[in-house]
Amino acid sequence: MREITSLPTLLVEPIVRAALVEDLGRAGDITTAAVVPKEARFSGAMVARRPGTIAGTEAARIAFDLVDPTLDVSILQPDGSVVEPGQPVMHIKGPAQSVVTAERTALNFISHLSGIAT
């Protein structure tokens, strides 16, 4: 795997923040707040659906961090990694409401950027 130089967080964070604002609007994630118990915890992996090259992991991590800095996010396959279906890319652990609130934005970045990288 060729080493990939990441963009500085200073450049990526405003884009991720704007995506979260667009996704959540003024009211926030009211569906998650209504359906997922506040005390529920989550621990799981984001896995590759198709073979390809991973990109956007830092943007995804920032999305989780902006929603809830207490989330434990581990990048298992850094940008530039070639993955097969079912291979874990990230592991996320923490309050379920926070994970569900950030996941759509995080997945959008990884899906779109990995598609381009592949």
Language-model regions: role of each:
Residues 2-118:
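Acidic/glycine-rich phosphate/pyrophosphate-binding loops and surrounding catalytic core
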